[in-house]
Amino acid sequence: MKILMRADTHVSYSVPAEGPKANFTFSQVLAALSVSLCSLVVGFVSAYTSPALVSMTDRTITSFEVTKDAGSWVGGIMPLAALAGGITGGPLIEYLGRRTTILATAVPFIVSSLLIACAVNVIMILCGRFLTGFCVGIASLSLPVYLGETLQPEVRGTLGLLPTALGNIGILVCYVAGSFMNWSMLAFLGAALPVPFLILMIIIPETPRWFVNRGQEERARKALKWLRGKEADVEPELKDLMQSQAEADSQARRNTCLELFKRINLKPLSISLGLMFFQQFSGINAVIFYTVQIFKDAGSTIDSNLCTIIVGIVNFFATFMGILLIDRLGRKILLYISDIAMILTLSILGGFFYCKAHGPDVSHLGWLPLTCFVIYILGFSLGFGPIPWLMMGEILPAKIRGPAASVVTAFNWFCTFVVTKTFQDLTVAMGAHGAFWLFGVVCIVGLFFVIICVPETRGKSLEEIERKMMGRVPISAVVNIKPFSFNM
């Protein structure tokens, strides 16, 4: 799944080398929780098709026909709409503000779910899914920008985990509820989830950086006071923000989107695009969107709805494992582990479905698909899930980070659409085994891409990474591992 955890797309940070240790102020926790509740909604709607399509295509439950082709569009139209939303979200967060843009998605999220819940034909469902996807695309840009501009660097890693965690909770909620709700009732639940997010977003302020960008120094000061605490001295931070904005304005006048295609910038852009390609063509969103259908086709001896719940739980806990390990093992080691796990499990899944279709009998191995799915999700969530987004924010040069990240984000959503829309067609043309083997071959190519092209960025500042990516100093492609500390 691509729950939509996007890196810092339209903003670059100026972080002092030294500074006071940040505290987990209640206001910062509240701000992070408020926007992360939007991520919970995103997780829920992204996973919706997995449990919903089974009852949606059942004529004893649904009063109108949903063909297999229409079902593929129910899954595929959301990422296509998210691509459009992602492109639209960039200008919106600049002109309306980060908070206002996020807040503006709440009501459409509710309306889109109600449109699906009350649908009397496939067109209404598709319209609801398109509106849902459009909001998801906007959220995918605006959530990380808001958090990046409001949280202090010392707590950004911990509180920045909340969107990923709540997004995975949203997936799990959808799987659990989908085990006993039909598609219509599940959509009604989806309409209720944005309400807490809507209420909390009204309470929190706009980001100080956006106020500074608009020349509203006093409002920026008030927002910083709210976020840092009334007793905090916010003047040094405000001064840094104003200086950073002045430098960004100066660069914006000198550089255009044509900078993206200069040879010196193509290397980091190509690496980021490559990581996004291999992330999506590992087949993750096909797995998330069609989990129930896959287990049903596999003839697993374990209830398909229970299988999806187990997959959701694994996805949730694997996220925390990745966070704990990424600054210990480094990016490349986790990408290696991730790729190898996906290659092995996709190969075995392909073999299982081949034997199921052509023999020998594998009915006694009904537990095998679930085992492979668990390891596959675990591997993806450790590496190729979060790291492409993290590295997008690390390796793209500051002066092109905004437009470059928009290109990378749009490309990711395009790949998501292609995978989710064509998965069922692939299973018809090649068989389920052929589809899984194809994803496995892509993962093998992705492994070589990581070995040869992807730099190790652990422990390096953004400035150091940029100097190396620009070729001013050589960059190492060799992994480096930080020893574990057992101090409590």
UniProtKB/Swiss-Prot annotation:
GO molecular function, one term: sugar transmembrane transporter activity
Topology of this chain in the membrane: Multi-pass membrane protein
Keywords: Cell membrane, Glycoprotein, Membrane, Transmembrane, Transmembrane helix
InterPro entries: MFS_dom, MFS_ERD6/Tret1-like, MFS_sugar_transport-like, MFS_trans_sf, MFS_Trehalose_Transporter, Sugar/inositol_transpt, Sugar_transporter_CS
The keyword Transmembrane helix is annotated on this UniProt entry: yes
Location of this chain's protein in the cell: Cell membrane
Domain of life: Eukaryota
Entry annotated with the keyword Translocase: no
Intervals, Extracellular compartment: 50-72, 127-129, 182-184, 290-305, 354-372, 424-433
Principal location class: membrane
Residues carrying a glycan: N182
CDD domains per the UniProt record, alphabetical: MFS_GLUT6_8_Class3_like (cd17358)
Gene Ontology terms: cellular component: plasma membrane
Family: Belongs to the major facilitator superfamily. Sugar transporter (TC 2.A.1.1) family. Trehalose transporter subfamily.
Function description: Fails to transport trehalose.
Annotated PANTHER family: FACILITATED TREHALOSE TRANSPORTER TRET1-1-RELATED, PTHR48021
Protein name per UniProt: Facilitated trehalose transporter Tret1-2 homolog
Gene that produces this protein: Tret1-2
